[in-house]
Curated annotation (Swiss-Prot):
GO BP annotations, alphabetical order: autophagy of mitochondrion; early endosome to Golgi transport; mitophagy; protein transport; reticulophagy
Domain PX: 1-137
Organism: Schizosaccharomyces pombe (strain 972 / ATCC 24843)
UniProt keywords, alphabetically: Autophagy, Cytoplasm, Endosome, Lipid-binding, Membrane, Protein transport, Transport
Keyword Cytoplasm among UniProt keywords: yes
A GO CC annotation given for this chain: endosome
Composition bias, Low complexity: 203-212
Domain of life: Eukaryota
Protein name: Autophagy-related protein 20
Organism placement in taxonomy: Eukaryota, Fungi, Dikarya, Ascomycota, Taphrinomycotina
Family per record: Belongs to the sorting nexin family.
Predominant location category: cytoplasm
Written domain comment of the UniProt record: The PX domain binds phosphatidylinositol 3-phosphate which is necessary for peripheral membrane localization of ATG20 to the perivacuolar punctate structures.
Region of interest (Disordered), residue spans: 1-21, 179-272
Length: 534
């Protein structure tokens, strides 16, 4: 491997503690090493006077692992992969481009600092091995007892996988829901446990999208413009006051929950209202950043790049005029040409600093906001999963009552008995359920040709729902216990990020204006001295 000396070591990061917890965020990426064949790059991480080397793919696996262990947490993002366009233009230099490696090093260092601020990740033993263990990351992962199934839906995972899960045996059968779209239970739900997960409903909270498709930016140059495909997931780089909410439904007794649902009120709970309101704020802010601020900054960078090119060409043009005039005038033209060339050089420096100090941090801020939106969405879906199970329990109780009524009237025909149960189920279906889900349930019952429902099946179904509802309530309670800390972490990260952005905007423009002013004041002085000699 060959050491890449083009990376300039940065000044020491200011140490800070999160709420006096003793976790220092003093961590750096001080260098990069490219493999001899150029196939990968390793980054040197220094923390607490210890140094380890990690590849970009190691960072990817760490993020995926943290998102699996903390589905309800705001896991900081890492920069995206090299764009296909830039790789197509420079296939052999993509891994060794100094400008791109510097950009990625800055963003990975920011990721590590945010992880050290995170209330859960900073004390995670796997993350500790990542920043301290000198053993290769592949070997470290092989030695850990991690679940092999990485495609499990997040709604079937505990909110915090690092703690004991008393409902682990129920996770695989937990129902999946979509945002604001649930299918009502039917008589087919009265089958064994595996049929509780309605195939017409699927969680819209899929595992995080591939990191290469996330918001990403690259240092813009004359032949490579920044590329960052910003999807429309809700996110925001602002730090508004976060509403405090508690899962009050989980604190009610089963009787109270059933009576509150059976009242027939369709108004959402205060918990869901708070989450919906905050998520809407996230969407509005992110749309402004995506459609207004980000394009404006990109346009500014492009204009600065064009200005640098024009100034350099203008300086060259003035240089060419020196051969066409007498010596005194040629000296004047030489001074002006030098001034224009220096202005072009200052514009190039201004473009690079503005990109690294402002644009890159803004994109990372949007990525972090997307992670926060995913955590809030997980919370919303957990509440909907719990409400869905509460509805199923009501339906099951209705069926039991109907079955008892029919048992007291033996003259009722079995087919009439089934229709009575079906009408009870349909009467509980509300407008929030999809037509497709109802139609699918009807077709399923028709094909199966069910004509009777045993009391044992009803009781087994009811017991299963009660156990799953207990698991959902436990999940919501766990999320509430650390959600305030998660939102506080998010607010601190975004506030710190935007304080740095505002400071960087001022410093970049002030430095550019000051150097240009000094250069042209010096040019005026030189021209005045030349004029005295004419």
């Amino acid at each position: 491997m060959a050491q890449d000396d083009s990376y300039e070591e940065k000044p020491e990061v200011i140490s800070s503690d999160s709420g006096g917890s003793g976790y220092s965020t003093e961590i750096q990426i001080v260098g990069t090493v490219t493999s001899s064949d150029g196939s990968y790059v390793e980054y040197e991480i220094v923390h607490q006077k210890r140094s380890v080397w990690r590849r970009y793919s190691d960072f990817e696996s760490l993020v995926k692992l943290m998102r699996r262990q903390y589905p309800a947490a705001i896991v900081p993002p890492i920069p995206g992969k090299q764009s296909l366009l830039s790789y197509a233009k420079h296939p052999r230099k993509a891994k060794s481009d100094a400008e791109f490696l510097n950009f990625r090093s800055r963003m990975l260092e920011l990721f590590l600092r945010q992880c050290l601020l995170h209330p859960c990740i900073r004390s995670n033993p796997i993350f500790d091995k990542f920043i301290h263990s000198t053993v290769s990351w592949h070997v470290t992962l092989s030695s850990l007892d991690l679940p092999k199934d990485s495609n499990t839906d997040p709604l079937r995972l505990p909110p915090i996988a690092t703690e004991h899960d008393p409902f682990a045996h129920l996770r695989s059968s937990m129902p999946l829901v979509m945002a604001n779209s649930l299918s009502p239970p039917s008589s087919r739900a009265l089958k064994p446990i595996h049929s509780l997960s309605n195939p017409s409903t699927a969680s819209s909270l899929e595992p995080s999208s591939p990191l290469g498709s996330e918001d990403e930016c690259h240092p813009p140059t004359s032949d490579m413009q920044p590329t960052h495909e910003l999807n429309e997931s809700p996110s925001t780089p602002t730090a508004p006051d976060f509403p405090h909410y508690n899962s009050s439904p989980s604190e009610l007794s089963p009787t109270q929950r059933r009576s509150s649902i059976s009242n027939g009120k369709d108004a959402p709970s205060p918990v869901l209202k708070d989450l919906t309101s905050y998520t809407q704020e996230v969407i509005v802010c992110r749309k402004f950043l995506h459609h207004s601020l980000s394009p404006s900054i990109h346009s500014t960078l492009s204009s600065i790049s064009k200005m640098e090119s024009c100034l350099s060409k203008l300086g060259s043009a003035f240089h060419s005029l020196t051969a066409l005039n007498e010596i005194q005038l040629a000296n004047h033209l030489q001074v002006i040409a030098n001034a224009f060339e220096f202005s072009g050089m200052y514009a190039k420096e201004f473009e690079q600093e503005f990109n690294s100090s402002v644009y890159e941090k803004m994109v990372q801020s949007m990525q972090l906001a997307k992670c926060a939106a995913d955590a809030l969405k997980y919370k919303q879906l957990k509440i909907q999963q719990r409400d869905f199970l509460q509805d199923q329990l009501i339906h099951s109780n209705t069926m039991s009552a109907t079955d008892s009524m029919v048992a007291a009237s033996p003259t009722i025909h079995p087919a009439t008995r089934l229709n009575t149960i079906q009408r009870a189920v349909v009467s509980q279906a509300k407008k929030g359920y999809t037509i497709f889900g109802r139609l699918q349930n009807v077709l399923h019952d028709f094909v199966e040709g069910e004509t009777s429902i045993s009391k044992e099946s009803l009781q087994q179904h009811k017991n299963t729902i009660e156990n799953q509802l207990a698991a959902a309530n436990w999940d919501c309670q766990k999320i509430d216990e650390f959600m305030d800390a998660e939102l506080k972490f998010y607010k601190e990260c975004q506030t710190s990020q935007w304080e740095e952005i505002i400071k960087s905007v001022h410093e970049c423009i002030y430095k550019w204006a000051q150097t240009n002013l000094q250069r042209w004041l010096r040019t005026r002085e030189e021209l005045e001295n030349l004029s005295k000699d004419i």
